[in-house]
């Protein structure tokens, strides 16, 4: 099993900054979302 962790990232001044973890919006929405121009990116994946 591989488990992945996602975090929100934004690019400012050509540098990407990492923010809070991504949260699914609502129970039905499986897509993880970030607000205010932040993008959800895979932080790391671990093999369990």
Curated annotation (Swiss-Prot):
Keywords: Disulfide bond, Neurotoxin, Oxidation, Secreted, Toxin. The modification Methionine sulfoxide is found at residue 44. Disulfide bonds join 4-34, 8-40, 22-45. SUPFAM superfamilies: omega toxin-like. GO terms for cellular component: extracellular region. Belongs to the neurotoxin 12 (Hwtx-2) family. 01 (Ap1a) subfamily. Is toxic to both insects and mammals. Induces reversible paralysis when injected into S.frugiperda larvae. Reduces both the amplitude and frequency of responses from muscle (GF-TTM and GF-DLM) pathways in the D.melanogaster giant fiber circuit, suggesting an action at the neuromuscular junction, which is mediated by glutamatergic receptors. In mice, intracranial injection of 30 ug causes increased urination, myoclonus, hypermotility with circular movements followed by respiratory and generalized seizures resulting in death within 25-35 minutes of injection. This is U1-theraphotoxin-Agm1a.
